Amino acid sequence: METADILVVSGAFFFAAFVKGITGLGFSTTALPFLVYAIGLKEALPLLIVPSIVSNLVVMRDAGHFQQTLMQFRRLYAAAPVGIFIGLVVLMWLDPTISSAVLGLVLIIYCVVSIIQPTFRLPTHLARQLEIPVGVTTGLVNGITGSQVIPVLPYLLSLPLTRDVFVQAVNICFTVSSIAFAIGLAWVGLFTIDTTQISFIGLVAMLVGLKLGTPIRDKLSHKSFRKAVLGLLLLLGAGLVLRPWL
């Protein structure tokens, strides 16, 4: 990878971590569209592994309720890797512009859900029945696009969870998915020593962005900044969807 590309990757990681520090929006989801525009989806996916796992582990440590949450959603977490491996097979078969368009659609759905923040509630029995399908589908979308938020995010939002349990549930899912994704990427030949080294370089930029973003949280209008970032991601997602026809 050229020096210019490494600088772009580091810049995307810094910005995504800075945004995460201020708003709590997902690191990978924010960084991914910038990387796709710069270097392509298949090239971008392995670079996110190390920073994603590290950032998720930090949040998992701080959120608490680990064992309780792990047991509550164990079937969902066990199902996600199955979908990831299927999704990676599909990714290797798909035309890159199509998989990028799917990512764009996922980003649009994510932004709409995040902006609207629906308050619907799933009945307990239905939520239980949907655990495995949601896990497999989230893994499938993850394998094809690299995004880990759909449909697990709206699913967890539909449950009566406390904020800490919700954050922990999301981050356990992200961490399990990232580890399975790393194994899958290595299996299909995308996660190599070179990409690992670049991923560690990006980790430094991510940590700096997170450190600088977190103290600013109380000084900026959190809601306005969050909506601005979501609006930007929405535009980037729309661009990825329209790209094959432009």
Feature names for model-found ranges:
Residues 5-6, 11, 36-53, 97-107, ...:
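Structural signature of hydrophobic alpha-helical transmembrane segments
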Residues 11, 15, 50-57, 74, ...:
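Hydrophobic residues within alpha-helical transmembrane segments
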Residues 38-41, 63-70, 157-165, 189-192:
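Juxtamembrane helix-boundary/capping and inter-helix hinge elements in multi-pass membrane proteins
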Residues 42-45, 97-100, 129, 164, ...:
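Residues that define the loop-to-transmembrane-helix transition and helix capping
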Residues 44, 86-91, 140-147, 181, ...:
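Hydrophobic alpha-helical transmembrane segments in multi-pass integral membrane proteins
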Residues 47-96, 179-223:
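Selective hydrophobic functional segments
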